[in-house]
Amino acid sequence: MALLPDKEKLLRNFLRCANWEEKYLYIIELGQRLPELRAEDGSPQNSIQGCQSQVWIVMRQNAQGIIELQGDSDAAIVKGLIAVVFILYDQMTPQDIVNFDVRPWFEKMALTQHLTPSRSQGLEAMIRAIRAKAAALS
C-alpha cells in the first residue's frame, strides 16, 4: 500500500480536483498504482458477485493480525474504486474492518452521488464482501 495515499491525503487530493472529470482520472490513477494480482488469485473464490465488471479481492492476515488486501478489475474506474476502498481499510485488523463504516468517507468525497447506480451497487458489493471475509477472520 506504500504506493497509495493514506485516508486523509486521499480526501485532500480528491477535494483538490477541480471537477468530476479530474476526480475520475484520479480514481483511475489510484487503480493503476495497485500491485498486479497473481494469476492464481484471479480465481472464482476471490470473485466479487454483484459487480457489473469482473472484480477480484484477496484478503490475507499478516503475522501482526493486520489485513492485507489485493484486488483487480477488468474496468479502470472499478479498479480505482477498489484502490479507494483499500486505502480506507489500510492497516486494520479484521475487527477494525467490521466496525469501520466507509460511507461517511464516501459522503465527504461526494463519491456515490457521481457513480452510476450499477457502479454504486458494485461498490457496496465490494464492501460487503470485504466485511464478510473480515468477520470470518475475527
UniProtKB/Swiss-Prot annotation:
NCBIfam families: PRK09296.1 (NF006792). It comes from the Bacteria. This is Cysteine desulfuration protein SufE. Keywords: Cytoplasm. GO terms for biological process: iron-sulfur cluster assembly; sulfur compound metabolic process. PANTHER family: CYSTEINE DESULFURATION PROTEIN SUFE, SULFUR ACCEPTOR PROTEIN CSDE. Disulfide bonds: none annotated. Pfam families: SufE. It is found in: Cytoplasm. The active site is at residue 51. It comes from Shigella flexneri. Belongs to the SufE family. Homodimer. Interacts with SufS. The keyword Cytoplasm applies. Participates in cysteine desulfuration mediated by SufS. Cysteine desulfuration mobilizes sulfur from L-cysteine to yield L-alanine and constitutes an essential step in sulfur metabolism for biosynthesis of a variety of sulfur-containing biomolecules. Functions as a sulfur acceptor for SufS, by mediating the direct transfer of the sulfur atom from the S-sulfanylcysteine of SufS, an intermediate product of cysteine desulfuration process. Pathway: Cofactor biosynthesis; iron-sulfur cluster biosynthesis. One of its GO terms (cellular component) is cytoplasm.
